Amino acid sequence: TYWYCWTDKIQENNLELTELFNETVGKEKGIHVTAEYQGTYDECHQKLQAAFVANEMPDVSVMEISSIRRFAENGVIEPLDSYIEASGIDMTDFYDALLLNGQVDGSCYGLPYLRSTPIMYYNNTLLKEAGYDGANLKTWDDLKEMAVAVHEKTGGYGISQYSYIWTLDAFMIEHGSSVLNDDETATNLNSEAGKEVIGFFRDLIDQGVVHAFNNTESDKVTADVQNEDTAIWFSSTGDLTKFSSMADELGFELGVGFIPMEECYGTPTGGCNLVMMSKLPDKKKEAAWEFIRFMTDTEQTVKSSIKTGYLPARKSAGESETMKAYFEEMPMARVALNQLTYAN
């Protein structure tokens, strides 16, 4: 059994790849995988905790990267080192910034699957109405200038954003800090970096330039985008196909870029890895590993990236002829991959 999260293109990708596994590797090795939808990451994690207590766990699950340490330390998920070694997988083929999130105390507990960074999206049609081009939006000063201009000249919002700790972390990283301290025991929000980042957006909110929402209202940002009431927003690279389709349907010019820089460029990474549950009998563990290995190999990584807009987690995938052709067709998809250079 395989537990996955999210609907739309992500759900389609999970179901298609699971079916492909069953028809190929699964058929050859006598393994059949049933994919089961579990809602959001938080909902899935809560169900995993309950299933662990009840000893009714799936065999494989997606796991949002910030939760891997907690589940590993509590013995819920299995270290994968012995399977990796026996399979001879070249772990250097995974981008370092994505691979490290799956490691806890020197052991690997998850392989990168649907991985992402936050990126800047913009409605270039609105920016051009205000006399700017989003391709030139590189710094915090640019961000403020363009956002204010859109608000003053079009009456819309320069930026729409819900309270998204991931985006906040990107801006903190650009100040040489992060939302949490290195031990993840306290926040850095009262540091000079935190005060500067929060103050920057607080001023723009007070001016009516930023349309701000709480952390459960991401749909309201999407509504602003659909209504063409906002010029700039920050979201996952995994949303690229969604916003690209929206722009095509509504007829506005969509652009994407790095998170605007202050002292330097910077970004956290996000998304999910694939993990194996503990407490499984050996035969189930072997089957679970075959599925994880299949889902994260180069060919499936390419398919997942093109289908969903998530990053190609393997170098061999990112450099494949298929991905190169896709990047030619969809240059915006390359932005997040290039931004990995600055990932924390």
Task: Tell where the protein language model's regions lie, with residue ranges.
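A structural signal for short loop-to-beta-strand junctions that line the ligand-binding cleft
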Residues: 50-51, 56-59, 87-126, 157-161, ...
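Conserved N-terminal structural module of periplasmic/extracytoplasmic solute-binding proteins
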Residues: 1-73, 85-92, 261-264, 283-287
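Glycine-centered hinge/linker elements that transmit conformational signals in sensory
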Residues: 146-149, 185-214, 259
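Ligand-binding "clamshell"
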Residues: 71-79, 105-107, 174, 243-261, ...
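Periplasmic solute-binding protein
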Residues: 66-81, 97-135, 161-184, 268-277, ...
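Short helix-initiation/N-cap motifs at beta->coil->alpha
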Residues: 37-47, 66, 138-145, 213-227
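Long, aromatic- and glycine/proline-rich binding clefts that accommodate carbohydrate-like moieties
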Residues: 254-257, 306-344
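Extracytoplasmic/periplasmic substrate-recognition and gating elements
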Residues: 23, 28-32, 130, 199, ...
